[in-house]
């Protein structure tokens, strides 16, 4: 059996050794809940990685959003390169659920755009849980939504061993049952091609390898893994297991049973609607449901088949849906990152989904059984959650009530202490902020400013820009990828000040930021609560000169508690440093790191690392260019590379080349 192998050049330091020891002790003692109260920059992920390596248990890591999940995936991947670190998030790039608005008699059809790469990673995650003990799955709240049951899923898998008696046509039929499609021209994921007695199959969960099965008469003569691009054989295999293309694939006999159950419910519902004089609703329901049944009978699936999941999984009415938790082994571990955000998210999902579906059922768009296609309720989630570690700098009330043990990780391995917090009058906040920004820009440090409203952020950005400050702002209209680009540009020094509202909190890792300014800090509410203030102040904790300024006319209870907690942590950190002769060291982190985590992870990560390295080399080379002829020659070379990268569909690398060319053209004009 594979074991977790932690690969790192660091040893636990600061509060980490004690935190790791206590967490391991708690897990082995059977504690159902523990809380790791770890400040920003204290290495919480590293501590959790050490715990996983010591207890040797498969782990589910729950993050509050895709960006943080991707960062954690990247970190765990680097800590456990020889183990199965997987990524399970929603595979929708865009999702519009079906809905009905009675007031305007408007029905909105379900519309979605599925990210093929993330779908592959989800399949890879469940495969890892079913086949391996050394699995770490990084997920979001997506894990509480319905998934095909593992029992049904496993019934559909296809095992092929070398030496098996296997008819070619039978193999092709089984692949079709798994929803694989034959395509001899375009060999892509979840397809197969047949060339005589050689069958090439591209597994649905694979991103790197395809499988070649060679038959001699009706016997499997050879199984090999090969590169689907070059055709090069990577290795010979004694056996291989093919998993279905979708988690919702169902055996034929189960489908037939489900159809009978749906027909019975349809008749009961039609009778109810007609008896209540809802003839339009009855006609609509009958037409839609019979069309779906015909599709299921002929093709094995239909659009919106998840609405019949109760029958497909054989569950009684009202039972919890099968989810990713059903794939977890009994000895699994659950780690909830930024638990003060993640736990309330889990509780919020059920009610919103229920409200929308009840309207669809009432007006004849869906059968009542569609209500069972839902996320888990909070009490159901609590019932299936394994031993849990909450991880947060500001644990919430739920963690306080449930944690059997609270473990503090306040002292950072780098010796860095929490930023000094200062309260200044709100009356002159903008002018005072401008003078503070000028000081920081002079020493090439960055500044974060958080405001209360979008309008305020825009006005402040305009004001600072008018005074010569290189500034940008973040708001809810900016998508995740662009948000990451903005943070990257701030770190690179493309601009010096970033203004935001509620986006400058969890998960922003920016060692270059030395000042956090919180405007109108005395306006009590969600954005100025104790937890929000502590999280925002923590953004300056990775810099040696970190400082936070709260602009307020009075000190609120939230401010007092946030400042008090920051001072308590700061005193403990300074005392530890003095007792152990530690001199604080600033954090220097590669700017490419944030992009590694925040873009969709996968097999192309090596290419991205190479891309970042190439960009660095380009930058060094560009600095050495002097004459206009040298610059012009370099522009031509880069343009050729850019067009080649675009032809190879390497658009991220091509975009970097484009930016380099733009900089060189500016230099050419200045020469």
From Swiss-Prot:
Keyword tags: ATP-binding, Cytoplasm, DNA damage, DNA excision, DNA repair, Excision nuclease, Nucleotide-binding, SOS response
Any one GO molecular-function label of the UniProt entry: ATP hydrolysis activity
Listed GO CC annotations: cytoplasm; excinuclease repair complex
Domain called Helicase C-terminal: residue spans: 429-582
Domain named Helicase ATP-binding: residues: 25-412
CDD domains: DEXHc_UvrB, SF2_C_UvrB
Residue ranges occupied by any UVR domain in the UniProt entry: 632-667
Superkingdom classification of source: Bacteria
Pfam families: Helicase_C, ResIII, UVR, UvrB, UvrB_inter
Gene Ontology biological process terms in this record: nucleotide-excision repair; SOS response
Predominant cellular place of this UniProt entry's protein: cytoplasm
Residues holding ATP: 38-45
Keyword Cell inner membrane: no
Cellular localisation: Cytoplasm
Renumbered ranges of motif Beta-hairpin: 91-114
UniProt cross-references to Gene3D superfamilies, sorted A to Z: 6.10.140.240, P-loop containing nucleotide triphosphate hydrolases, UVR domain
Subunit structure: Forms a heterotetramer with UvrA during the search for lesions. Interacts with UvrC in an incision complex.
Domain notes: The beta-hairpin motif is involved in DNA binding.
Family indicated by similarity: Belongs to the UvrB family.
Function: The UvrABC repair system catalyzes the recognition and processing of DNA lesions. A damage recognition complex composed of 2 UvrA and 2 UvrB subunits scans DNA for abnormalities. Upon binding of the UvrA(2)B(2) complex to a putative damaged site, the DNA wraps around one UvrB monomer. DNA wrap is dependent on ATP binding by UvrB and probably causes local melting of the DNA helix, facilitating insertion of UvrB beta-hairpin between the DNA strands. Then UvrB probes one DNA strand for the presence of a lesion.
Protein name per the record: UvrABC system protein B
Lineage: Bacteria, Pseudomonadati, Pseudomonadota, Gammaproteobacteria, Pseudomonadales
């Amino acid at each position: 059996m594979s074991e977790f192998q932690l690969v790192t050049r660091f040893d636990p330091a600061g509060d980490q050794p004690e935190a790791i020891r206590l967490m391991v002790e708690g897990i082995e003692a059977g504690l159902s809940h523990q809380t790791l109260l770890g400040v920003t920059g204290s290495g919480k992920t590293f501590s959790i990685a050490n715990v996983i390596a010591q207890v040797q248990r498969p782990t589910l890591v729950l993050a509050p959003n895709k960006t943080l999940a991707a960062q954690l995936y990247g970190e765990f991947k680097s800590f456990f390169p020889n183990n199965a670190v997987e990524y399970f998030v929603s595979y929708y790039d865009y999702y519009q659920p079906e809905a009905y608005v009675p007031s305007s008699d408007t029905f909105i059809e379900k519309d979605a755009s599925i990210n093929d790469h993330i779908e592959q990673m989800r399949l890879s995650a469940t495969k890892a849980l079913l086949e391996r003990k050394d699995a770490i799955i990084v997920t979001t709240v997506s894990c509480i939504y319905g998934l095909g049951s593992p029992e049904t899923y496993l019934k559909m898998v296809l095992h092929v061993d070398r030496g098996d008696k296997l008819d070619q046509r039978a193999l092709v039929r089984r692949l079709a049952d798994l929803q694989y499609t034959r395509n001899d021209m375009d060999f892509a994921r979840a397809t197969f091609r047949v060339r005589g007695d050689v069958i090439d199959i591209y597994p649905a969960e694979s991103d790197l390898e395809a499988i070649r099965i060679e038959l001699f008469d009706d016997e499997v003569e050879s199984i090999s893994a090969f590169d689907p691009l070059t055709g090069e054989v990577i290795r010979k295999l004694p056996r291989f297991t093919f998993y279905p293309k979708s988690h919702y694939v169902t055996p034929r006999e189960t489908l037939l049973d489900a159809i009978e159950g749906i027909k019975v419910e349809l008749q009961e519902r039609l009778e109810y609607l007609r008896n209540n004089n809802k003839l339009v609703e009855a006609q609509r329901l009958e037409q839609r449901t019979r069309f779906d049944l015909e599709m299921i009978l002929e093709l094995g699936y239909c659009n919106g088949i998840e609405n019949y999941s109760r029958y497909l999984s054989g569950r009684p009415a009202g039972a919890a849906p099968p989810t990713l938790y059903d794939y977890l082994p009994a000895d699994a571990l659950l780690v909830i990152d930024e638990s003060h955000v993640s736990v309330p998210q889990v509780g919020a999902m059920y009610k919103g989904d229920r409200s929308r579906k009840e309207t669809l059922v009432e007006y004849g768009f869906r059968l009542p059984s569609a209500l069972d296609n839902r996320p888990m309720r909070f009490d159901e989630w609590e019932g299936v959650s394994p031993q849990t570690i909450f991880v947060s700098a500001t644990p919430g009330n739920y963690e306080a009530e449930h944690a059997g043990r609270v473990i503090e990780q306040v002292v950072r391995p780098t010796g860095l202490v929490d930023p000094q917090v200062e309260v200044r009058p709100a009356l002159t906040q903008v002018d005072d902020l401008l003078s503070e920004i000028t000081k920081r820009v002079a020493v090439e440090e960055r500044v974060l400013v958080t405001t209360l409203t979008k309008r305020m952020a825009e006005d402040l950005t305009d004001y600072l820009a008018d005074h010569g400050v290189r500034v940008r702002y973040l708001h809810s209209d900016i998508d995740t990828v662009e948000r990451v680009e903005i943070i990257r540009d701030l770190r690179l020094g493309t601009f010096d000040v970033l203004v935001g509202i509620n986006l400058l909190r969890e998960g922003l890792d920016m060692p270059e930021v030395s000042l956090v300014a919180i405007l109108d800090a005395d306006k009590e509410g969600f954005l100025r609560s104790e937890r929000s203030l502590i999280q925002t102040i923590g953004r300056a904790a990775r810099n040696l000169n970190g400082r936070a300024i709260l602009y307020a006319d009075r000190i609120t209870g939230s401010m007092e508690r946030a400042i008090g907690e920051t001072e308590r942590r700061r005193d403990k950190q300074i005392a530890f440093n003095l007792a152990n002769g530690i001199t604080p060291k600033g954090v220097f982190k590669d700017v490419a790191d944030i992009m590694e985590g925040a873009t969709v992870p996968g097999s192309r990560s090596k290419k991205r690392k190479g891309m970042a390295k190439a960009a660095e080399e380009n930058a060094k080379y560009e600095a050495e260019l002097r004459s206009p002829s040298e610059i012009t020659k370099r522009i031509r070379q880069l343009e050729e590379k850019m067009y080649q990268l675009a032809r190879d569909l390497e658009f991220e690398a091509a975009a970097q080349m484009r930016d380099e060319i733009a900089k060189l053209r500016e230099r050419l004009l200045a020469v």
